[in-house]
């Protein structure tokens, strides 16, 4: 079978290789991936920054964002059927003993992750995974279900922000929202906040006001600010940082008002020396800072439900977030996206 692979920690080893077709073991299923999303994590692995193959193997199959069809069941699988369309979660505990609903809190070194650490991913014609980590996709969301994995991170972060913000004091009533970044995470955060009935939302990026990103922000009722030209005005009750830039994360805290909640959703590899004085001020003004990376199956379920709602509320807007689609044979193009792109997807087979 064809598979998009790398030799982990070897820069630029990306290649389409012929790999043996796997067979499902007990409690596992064989999947036929339909679409696989591409993100910055994949780029980092391709650049040799991190990643690990399954034990005893040289190659790692990429792809942790996927929607797939169940095509074969291993023994004792009773929660899905052949023909079901599903989204697999990413993380699998190895020595971690937390329940399935909390595996996103497993300590580092106690888990494996599809397409990242010790488990093959889904950028291939066939893949196996544990059946209990699958979320069924209703037919009305199949064409956008590839967005579920990045959306799960957003769901987790926003859910934590709203619940923990309220837990501090019942009268907390956030209104103004700032989302920094108009990539896939930022746009999905905008979608979720609009579904949660937030009306005063500002999204910032560096693209022109006539760009696709700016148009999509305005299309569902938010304000777009090009930070190359204009400044962000005022304080916000909730700030969602989705750029992955250390300086932007630092800047996000400057725009957080008293009693506000900041949600950091980026992977911050560009470490820089920063003045911590503003952070000390945050504590004195009752600010709450939350980070979220991996998400549990509950957040995936929330994501699928919100994709269904968003298609009803916003029509074709959600699908417009997928700006680049390539075939498996054209895989290299998926990992080279420009500033105007939002989400790149490899279409493994037709829907």
From Swiss-Prot:
Substrate binds at residues 41, 113, 149, 294. NADP(+) binds at residues 182-185, 265-267, 292-294. GO terms for molecular function: D-glucose binding; glucose 1-dehydrogenase (NAD+) activity; glucose 1-dehydrogenase (NADP+) activity; NAD+ binding; NADP+ binding; zinc ion binding. Its cofactor is Zn(2+). InterPro entries: ADH-like_N, Glc_1-DH_arc, Glu_dehyd_C, GroES-like_sf, NAD(P)-bd_dom_sf. It is an enzyme of class 1 (oxidoreductase). It catalyses: D-glucose + NAD(+) = D-glucono-1,5-lactone + NADH + H(+); D-glucose + NADP(+) = D-glucono-1,5-lactone + NADPH + H(+). Zn(2+) binds at residues 39, 64-65, 149. The keyword NADP applies. It holds the Pfam family ADH_N. Keywords: Carbohydrate metabolism, Metal-binding, NAD, NADP, Nucleotide-binding, Oxidoreductase, Zinc. Its EC number is 1.1.1.47. One of its GO terms (biological process) is non-phosphorylated glucose catabolic process. It comes from the Archaea. Belongs to the zinc-containing alcohol dehydrogenase family. Glucose 1-dehydrogenase subfamily. Catalyzes the NAD(P)(+)-dependent oxidation of D-glucose to D-gluconate via gluconolactone. Can utilize both NAD(+) and NADP(+) as electron acceptor. Is involved in the degradation of glucose through a non-phosphorylative variant of the Entner-Doudoroff pathway. This is Glucose 1-dehydrogenase 1. It comes from Vulcanisaeta moutnovskia (strain 768-28). The lineage of its organism: Archaea, Thermoproteota, Thermoprotei, Thermoproteales, Thermoproteaceae.
